[in-house]
C-alpha cells in the first residue's frame, strides 16, 4: 500500500524526515500577489526577494488558494491519501481540496482519502504533518492513522508573534495609526489560533524579550508541560534561540524543532515574526 501526505503551503515543511517509495509528500502552492507581481509559493520561490518586493510596494497584497485541479493532480498515484490545509477561515484552500477529493473518488472509488482542516497554519501544521509521517511509518491501517491524527490534533496548538504589521495595514485589517505605533514603540503582537481556526490577539509586548515571556505565559495557560514544539520563523533565528532556551530551562526533555516559514507564512507573519506549534 502506498501513501501520500498532501498539504498546501500553509505548511512550512518542504519534505518529510524519511521519504520513500511507499510514502510521498506533496505541497500544493498558494500564489501571492504584490501589485502586479505574482509569486508562486513552491520550492523555487525566493522568499527574501518576495519580502523585499512587498516592503517596497505601497499597494495592497493578496493571496490566492490553489485550484481543485492542482489538488487533484497532487492526490493521484497513491492508495492512501491524507490531505491537510491551512485553516478554512482564512483561505479557500480547504474548499478547493474538498472539491478535488470528490473528483478523485469519482475517478477512483477504491482510493482512501481523508481531508483535515488544520484550523491553523505554520508550526502547528508542521507538527501535524510530522506526526502523520510517524504514524504511517508505524505501519498502521488507514483507519487507525485517521483516528490517531484526529485525536492528536486535539492536543496541538498554535501561538504567533508578529514584529511587523505592514501587510495588515495595507490590506485594511489594522489602521495606519496602530501600525505606526507598533513600529515606533517596538511592540510585538502575541496571538493564537482559536479552536474554530480564527486568529486572536492575546497580548501586546514591548520588545522581543517581553514577547518571549508573554509567549511562555500563554502556552502554559493552554496546558503546555514540555511537549513537542515546532517554531517556524521569518528571518528571526534569535527569537527561536530565546524561546528554546526558556522552554528547555523549564522542561529539559522538550523536543524543539525550528525552520523557516513558507512564502505564505512569511507573507503574513512578516520579518521577525513566528508561528509556533506545540503539544499540550
Swiss-Prot record:
PROSITE patterns assigned: DEGV (PS51482)
Residues that bind hexadecanoate: 63, 91
Taxonomic superkingdom: Bacteria
Coiled coil regions, renumbered to chain: none
Residue ranges annotated for the DegV domain, each copy included: 3-280
Keywords tagged on the record: Lipid-binding
Single Gene Ontology MF annotation: lipid binding
Pfam families in the record: DegV
InterPro entries to which the protein is assigned, alphabetical: DegV, DegV_C, DegV_domain_contain
General function of this protein: May bind long-chain fatty acids, such as palmitate, and may play a role in lipid transport or fatty acid metabolism.
Protein name per the record: DegV domain-containing protein spyM18_1709
UniProt source species: Streptococcus pyogenes serotype M18 (strain MGAS8232)
Source organism phylogeny: Bacteria, Bacillati, Bacillota, Bacilli, Lactobacillales
Amino acid at each position: 500500500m502506498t501513501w501520500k501526505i498532501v498539504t498546501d503551503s500553509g505548511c512550512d515543511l518542504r519534505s518529510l524526515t524519511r521519504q520513500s517509495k511507499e510514502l510521498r509528500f506533496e505541497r500544493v502552492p498558494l500564489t501571492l500577489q504584490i501589485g502586479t507581481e505574482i509569486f508562486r509559493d513552491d520550492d523555487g520561490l525566493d522568499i527574501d526577494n518576495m519580502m523585499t518586493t512587498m516592503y517596497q510596494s505601497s499597494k495592497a497584497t493578496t493571496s490566492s488558494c490553489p485550484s481543485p485541479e492542482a489538488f487533484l493532480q497532487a492526490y493521484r498515484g497513491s492508495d492512501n491519501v491524507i490531505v491537510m490545509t491551512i485553516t478554512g477561515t482564512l483561505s479557500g484552500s480547504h474548499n478547493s481540496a474538498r472539491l478535488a477529493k470528490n473528483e478523485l473518488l469519482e475517478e477512483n472509488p477504491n482510493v482512501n482519502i481523508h481531508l483535515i482542516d488544520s484550523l491553523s497554519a505554520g508550526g502547528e501544521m508542521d507538527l501535524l504533518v510530522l506526526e502523520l509521517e510517524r504514524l504511517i511509518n508505524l505501519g498502521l491501517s488507514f483507519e487507525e492513522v485517521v483516528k490517531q491524527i484526529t485525536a492528536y490534533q486535539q492536543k496541538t496548538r498554535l501561538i504567533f508573534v508578529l514584529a511587523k504589521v505592514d501587510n495588515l495595514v495595507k490590506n485594511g485589517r489594522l489602521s495606519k495609526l496602530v501600525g505606526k505605533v507598533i513600529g515606533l514603540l517596538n511592540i510585538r503582537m502575541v496571538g493564537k489560533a482559536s479552536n474554530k481556526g480564527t486568529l486572536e490577539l492575546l497580548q501586546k509586548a514591548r520588545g522581543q524579550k517581553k514577547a518571549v515571556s508573554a509567549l511562555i505565559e500563554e502556552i502554559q495557560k493552554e496546558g503546555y508541560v514540555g511537549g513537542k514544539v515546532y517554531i517556524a520563523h521569518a528571518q528571526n533565528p534569535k527569537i527561536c534561540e530565546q524561546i528554546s532556551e526558556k522552554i528547555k530551562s523549564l522542561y529539559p526533555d522538550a523536543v524543539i524543532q525550528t525552520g523557516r516559514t513558507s512564502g505564505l507564512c512569511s507573507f503574513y507573519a512578516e520579518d521577525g515574526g513566528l508561528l509556533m506549534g506545540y503539544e499540550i
